[in-house]
From Swiss-Prot:
Catalysed conversion reaction: D-glucuronate = D-fructuronate; aldehydo-D-galacturonate = keto-D-tagaturonate
Name recorded for this polypeptide: Uronate isomerase
Single GO biological process annotation from the record: D-glucuronate catabolic process
UniProt lineage: Bacteria, Pseudomonadati, Pseudomonadota, Alphaproteobacteria, Hyphomicrobiales
Pathway: Carbohydrate metabolism; pentose and glucuronate interconversion
Family statement: Belongs to the metallo-dependent hydrolases superfamily. Uronate isomerase family.
Length: 466
């Protein structure tokens, strides 16, 4: 299982040698992690991770969804159900189930990330199997008790320069405050994620809005609601936030008059919003958030196009983020036009667009980012954060948008130990792509070195204002 130093490089010797040289120049660069889902409490409390299953299996929906698809219950993986049904609590049993089914992950990015962590973090080069499951479990568990495996030590070991968490608009950010108060040098910053108080299609929307205005101390009116967002965005900024994040079902935007927007708010705040009103409210709020970003400087990320909770059985029994979200077709040209008509040429605005619809890369996203100064393309996301997905992304966007209308790499992960693995993968794939351009005489090698550095480090740091 030992990691091959030429993994993800071309099999053609000349191109592979170019990729080796390029990768050597970026391999040790610091990690900028501008968007992700690690827990701020890890850095605040700096406690040991409890066991291998809690570290690698239970929080990783890439892992749990694959096992679930093969007939293994989520309870058997230690996932707690909403109805109180018993779930497995023995970490060793969960690990054995994972190890016995390790073959399911052949050729997946999960295998790349896991084996990178095994070797580079724990020094384990055996391929996981039913036969060695207990031995590897014990080896990992022993190391997890040691000081060098605490979250802050790993932050330094991974050469992380900054990491952003993703946090609800009403989050008090107490763990971010604890990190700051501790005097530790690590840069752990929040990102403003207001979806719960913006998505009028959610059953808890009205209560989330009441919570938002309550925390902000503003009235429950359209203007009070907008002021509450401004208040909370400033609260996040004081704790280092540089971005907001918006996970909407579509990329639809709108630009209603103040009167129409106020009347729409009055309808949806009563609860049970119609489908059309919920969509229009989300659309208007993307435009309002863009307007706020011009005022306060937060970079705006839009992550549209996921059919959330597609499997109602999983959602009803286990809740959100259990691997049952599915990509759907997503349009951008017509949907973003109201926002772009108002703000697309404003140099104070940066909107980073992501997609789960790869067909939109060359048809819509690259042409849009190649024209509007306010737009940038986010990296390959979620299901396409993989060697083939990143390569397709480069091939489909570079000719129209270039490299400098993209923003480098996001690891976008809940799995802390996969952060260096994901950045290693992205740097290797980008270097392999650049090596091909050099070999084809479409790029000079000195230019490729510069682009490789920008993709690995500078673009993320610059775009996210880090």
């Amino acid at each position: 299982m030992a990691l091959n130093p030429d993994r993800l490089f071309s099999a053609e010797p000349g191109t592979r040698e170019i990729a080796r040289r390029l990768f050597a120049s970026v391999e040790k660069l610091p990690i900028i992690s501008p968007h992700g889902h690690t827990e701020p409490i890890w850095y605040a409390r700096n406690e040991a991770f409890p066991d291998p299953a809690s570290l690698f299996v239970k929080p990783d929906h890439y892992i749990t969804r694959m096992l679930y698809s093969q007939g293994h219950s989520l309870e058997s993986l230690g996932i707690a159900s909403r109805d109180g049904r018993p779930s497995e609590t023995d970490a060793r049993k969960i690990w054995r189930l994972f190890a016995t089914n390790w073959y399911l992950f052949r050729a997946t990015p999960s295998r790349l990330w896991f084996e990178h962590a095994m070797e580079t973090v724990f020094g384990i080069t055996e391929r996981l199997s039913q036969e060695n499951a207990d031995r590897i479990f014990d080896a990992i568990a022993d190391q997890l008790t040691q000081p060098h495996m605490r979250p802050r030590a790993l932050y330094d070991r991974f050469n992380i320069e900054a990491i952003s968490t993703t946090d609800a608009a009403t989050d008090p950010l107490i763990y971010h405050d604890e990190v700051i108060a501790s005097g530790w040098h690590g840069r752990i910053i929040p990102a403003y994620r207001p979806d719960a108080a913006v998505d009028a299609g959610r059953p808890d929307f009205a209560s989330e809005v009441e919570k938002l205005v309550g925390v902000a101390g503003t009235p429950l009116t359209w203007q009070g609601y907008l002021d509450a967002h401004r208040n909370r965005r400033e609260y996040f900024k004081r704790r280092g936030a540089t971005s907001s994040d918006h996970g909407h079902p579509t990329a639809q935007t709108a630009d209603l008059s103040a009167g129409d927007a106020s009347r729409l708010f009055d309808r949806v705040i009563k609860g049970n919003a119609s489908t059309s009103d919920a969509e229009m409210f989300r659309a208007q709020m993307l435009t309002e958030m863009a307007r706020m970003s011009i005022d306060d400087g937060l970079v705006m990320q839009i992550h549209p196009g996921s059919f959330r909770n597609h499997n109602p059985t999983v959602f009803e029994r286990f809740g959100l983020d259990k691997g049952a979200d599915i990509p759907r077709q997503t349009g951008f040209v017509d949907q973003l036009k109201p926002l772009l008509d108002g703000f697309g040429n404003d140099p104070r605005l940066t909107v980073i667009l992501f997609t789960l619809d790869e067909t939109a890369y060359s048809r819509e996203l690259a042409p849009l980012a190649g024209d509007y100064p306010a737009l940038k393309l986010g990296p390959a996301w979620w299901f396409f954060d993989s060697p083939e997905g990143i390569l397709r992304y480069r091939k489909l966007t570079t000719e129209t948008a270039g490299f400098y209308n993209t923003v480098g790499f996001n690891d976008d992960t809940r799995a802390y130990l996969s952060i260096p693995a994901r950045h290693d993968m992205a740097r290797r794939v980008d270097c392999a792509y650049l090596a091909g351009l050099v070999a084809d005489h479409r790029l000079e090698e000195d230019e490729a070195y510069e682009v490789a550095h920008d993709l690995a480090y500078r673009l993320a740091k610059q775009t996210y204002k880090l």
